[in-house]
């Protein structure tokens, strides 16, 4: 990998209530691209991944949030932490590096509307 390129894991969250998610590993991610550019890349790449079930390939993902950064503590939340949105939700106009993404970072890709609904009423179905 070239300098400035890292490996990150993207957790595709289909349902917060049912804890339905799939991790996808990306190698060679350029940290100098904007969050918006990375979202566009993910939206183009995910539907082409035949190893993902159709419900994950065809979902309306639109937001990214940091789940875990390498060598830092993890939360006890099974799908995604509902705290620290100001710091962990990625803003589209910043670069991945400025947003805090580094090698081995795990981020969530989800529908922001679903996240807000779940945050307002965090009940799991099982």
Swiss-Prot record:
Taxon lineage: Eukaryota, Metazoa, Chordata, Craniata, Vertebrata
Protein name: UPF0538 protein C2orf76
Similarity remark: Belongs to the UPF0538 family.
Any Pfam family the entry gives: DUF2340
Stored InterPro entries: UPF0538
PANTHER family, alphabetized: UPF0538 FAMILY MEMBER (PTHR18444), UPF0538 PROTEIN C2ORF76 (PTHR18444:SF9)
Domain of life of the organism encoding this protein: Eukaryota
Species annotation: Homo sapiens
Gene: C2orf76
């Amino acid at each position: 990998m070239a300098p400035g390129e890292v490996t990150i894991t993207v957790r595709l969250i289909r349902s917060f209530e049912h804890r339905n998610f799939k991790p996808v590993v990306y190698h060679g991610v350029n940290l100098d691209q904007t969050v918006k550019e990375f979202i566009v890349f993910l939206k183009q790449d995910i539907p082409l991944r035949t190893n993902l079930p159709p419900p994950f390939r065809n979902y309306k993902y639109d937001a990214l949030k940091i789940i875990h950064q390498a060598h830092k503590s993890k939360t006890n939340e099974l799908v995604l932490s509902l705290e620290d949105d100001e710091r962990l939700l990625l803003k589209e106009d910043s670069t991945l590096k400025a947003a805090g993404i580094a090698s081995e970072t795990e981020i969530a890709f989800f529908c922001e509307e679903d996240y807000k609904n779940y945050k307002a009423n965090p009940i799991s179905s099982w």
